[in-house]
Amino acid sequence: MRLEAIRSVYFVGAGGIGMSALIRYFLSKGKTVAGYDRTSSELTERLITEGAQIHYEEDIDLIPEECKDKASTLVVYTPAVPQGHAELTYFRENGFNIHKRSQVLGIITRSSKGLCVAGTHGKTTTSTMAAHLLHQSHVGCIAFLGGISKNYGTNLLLSATSPYTVIEADEFDRSFHWLSPWMSVITATDPDHLDIYGTKEAYLESFRHYTTLIQPGGALILHKGLEMQADVQPGVTTYTYSRNEGDFHAENIRIGNGEIFIDFVAPDTRINDIQLGVPVSINIENGVAAMALAHLSGATDEEIKQGMASFRGVDRRFDFKLKNDRIVFLSDYAHHPAEIAQSVKSVRELYQDKKITVIFQPHLYTRTRDFYRDFADSLSLSDEVILTEIYPAREQPIPGVTSQLIYDNLRPGIEKCICRKEDVLSLLTQKHTEVLVVLGAGDLDNYAPQITQLLSEKYHG
């Protein structure tokens, strides 16, 4: 596929976070961009104002004429879209050039030095942090991110001069196997997406294969203690990192008064008194990985220090919506048991003497079936759990798999209930809340503005 010959790009599933970064990229190249998504969202409406044509009905008559010339149109789809989708079927039957999102991302980034962040969790924050460190340094970067950077209000960063592209490397559907990393961080390999992989062993094998793709001369930055076996090519340097040990790590950690300061230790330098712009304990580890990437890419110690202090975070990643003396409300994308445990522990560290209420919307029937006991254990670290129905995304219901499975396995004595997401607001009006955490990768976050308004009126302070 020669991208130069493409005049229009059509996206089936335009509202996904990864798809939207590609939409913005092709708009920046002056292409005609159109697409379909199932529902309107703040993101799709933003894309329309930026120049994309997006509709919400599955109807081939709504495909713009410019996108019906198969010689000059590229069709991009996400695996979340059913194979029988009418528009996808139209393009397939008429011989259009059709590629998965991950394939297109691999093609676009092949000619640059890819700085990739892979792993079960932590990759969105780590990659966005690394992109910020480089973008505000003399090195610069292009970046395709899996979340909206609060510093830039977008998930795409551009540079006319930098050789580097920061990429969130997604293991879902083995998407990251299309990439050609120059350097890669691997944050975690807790099994996930077992609907795709089947077994833990197959999941770990997928990460092993991914490490073979790192280019000679580059580097692998591997979290200490992972089960996976790396298999890098000759000429690839392997480093380790973690919060407290490894080639890259933090020392002299100071947490207090809503602030975190650390010293960053690398094999050939030490940067003292770094302030975390988003002072959450998990960002110590994320920050070490991001700083390792930036350091190995040529950012100076002072640029790294300034960038860490000015980092503002990612939408829906430990995202404070409301914070005063009477009420704290934050939203977090955590949707895997290990992520939820980290999230709740980080909240507990900040608010040790307050009651922590978690509202969790489970994401996918298969993930709930595979991990319901682990979800219950992680959620039980809070004081109160409110469960909503499962968000299905791409899946059909599985008999017997509901939020009740998690509910029944929560620790004895914990306050708990199950409710429809539509009833969350009325439930919160009746409850006394001190720290509220909304967790999940589904659509419950769409209620965040209404929850924020309700809580600020109820606990104005």
Please tell me what each predicted stretch does:
Residues F11, Y77, V117-G119, V438:
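Hydrophobic Val/Ile/Leu positions in short beta-strands of Rossmann-like dinucleotide-binding domains
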Residues E50, A376-E434:
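C-terminal helical cap/extension that packs against the catalytic core
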Residues K68-L74, S162-P163, H432-E434:
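Short acidic/histidine-rich motifs immediately flanking catalytic phosphotransfer sites
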Residues R2-S8, G18, Y25, K29, ...:
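Nucleotide phosphate-binding/pyrophosphate-handling subdomain across enzymes
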Residues K31-R38, L220-K224, T357-F360, S382-P392:
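Short internal beta-strands
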Residues Y25-K31, L62-K68, P79-K224, M228-T237, ...:
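Phosphate-binding loop of NTP-binding sites
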Residues M1-K100, V104, A219, H249, ...:
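N-terminal leader/targeting and accessory segments in enzymes
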Residues Y36-D37, H55-I60, H99-Q103, F144-G146, ...:
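Beta-strand->loop->alpha-helix junctions that form or flank phosphate-binding loops
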